[in-house]
Amino acid sequence: MIPHPVPYLTWVKTLMPPVAHDLRPSGVPGRALPVSGSSVPDPTLSRRLAAAVADRHSTTADHVFLGLGTSGANVHALAALLQKGGELLCESPTYDPLWRTAAFLGAPVRFFERPPSARWAVDPLAVEARLSHTTRVVAITRLHNPTAAGTPEAVLEVLGEMAEAHDIYVLVDEVYLDFEPEAVPAFRVHPRLLTTGSLTKVYGLGWLRLGWILGDPELIRNAEQARDHSEVVLPDPPMALALANWDLLDGLCEEARARARQGARLAQQALGDLPGIDFRPDLGAPFGFLHFGGDDLALAERCAAEGAGVTPGSFFGAPGHLRIAWLGDPEATRTALSVLRGALLSRPA
C-alpha cells in the first residue's frame, strides 16, 4: 500500500456520491476551447508557454517552471526544497494534499493554526513560533482553502523577511488568487516566497493539466532536476491548446469573478440568517466555510441523499464545518443551497 494516502482526493475520485446539485467543486466548471492547437510536435512549445506565463505575471521565463497543474507544481516545489530531513510547516486548516505530498516525500510535517477567531488570517508571529531547526518550507494557500480568506501583501512581506532570516522558503499555493482583482502574486513580494498556480480553478481548464511555479531561478532549476524523476517533459497537446487560446484568459477570468459574486450572494441569502451558524462569505470568493458544530460527515451524507453535494470540513482538519462552493449553474446552486438550509434547520439541537 502506498504510504500517506490522501483521504480528500480518495473521497473526491472514488467515494464522493453523485448528486444533481453540487456545492463541492471549488473551481469554474470545465470549459470548451474554440481554437485547437497544432497536432505537429513542436520543440518550442514549453519555451513559448513559459514566456507567456512569465508575461502574464510580470516576470521573465527563468522564473517559471511549468508543471502538471498546481498539484504537479506543488510536488516539484516541495521536492526541490525539502532536502533529506527537511521539515514542512503547514497551515491548519488546509488543503489535505498540500501537506500529505510532503509526507509522501519523506518530510516531517508540523502545523500552525489559522484560527477562526482571527477570521482565518495568517499571523507571522504564530508561524515563526512554530519553526524548528529543521524547517525548510512553510506552506500556505491564498486564497485560503477551505475558507477563502485572503493574505495581504503586508503580511506576505513579513513572511518573506522571516523566511530570509531563517534561511527557508514560503510556498504559496495561489491557484485561486485570480478571483481577487489586482492581487499581486506572492513571488513578486519577496524573493523567499514562491507561487504555484494553474489554469484550473479560475479558468475552468483543469483538463489541460497546466500549472506553474513562479520563483527564484535557482529554485526553478532545482524543480527541473526533480522533474527528471517523474514526467521528464510536459506533453505537447495541452501546451499547444493553451497557447492557441491564451488571449481568452482575461475574459474567462472576468466571467469567473462574476460567477463568484453571484454565487456568494445566493449563499448569503440562503444561509446567512440561520441560528447557531457562523457563515460570513466574502462576496467575491468562489467558496466559503460554514461552521455549525455538528457531524459534518453525516450532514454531507444527508445532503447527498437529497441530491445536494457539500464538502465536509473534516477533510481540511476542521470538523464541524462545511466548505460550500458556488461556481456552477445558478439554478442548481439555489437548489443545493435550499437542501443544505433544510438540513441545517432540522439538525438535532
What is each PLM-predicted segment?
Residues M1, A80-I140:
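PLP-dependent aminotransferase-like
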Residues M1-H76, D247-L248, R347-A349:
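N-terminal small-domain helix-loop-helix segment of the aminotransferase-like
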Residues T60-V64, G85-E87, T134, P191-R192:
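Short acidic capping loops at alpha-helix termini that bridge into adjacent secondary structure
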Residues R302-G309, F316-A349:
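PLP-dependent enzyme catalytic core of the Aspartate aminotransferase-like
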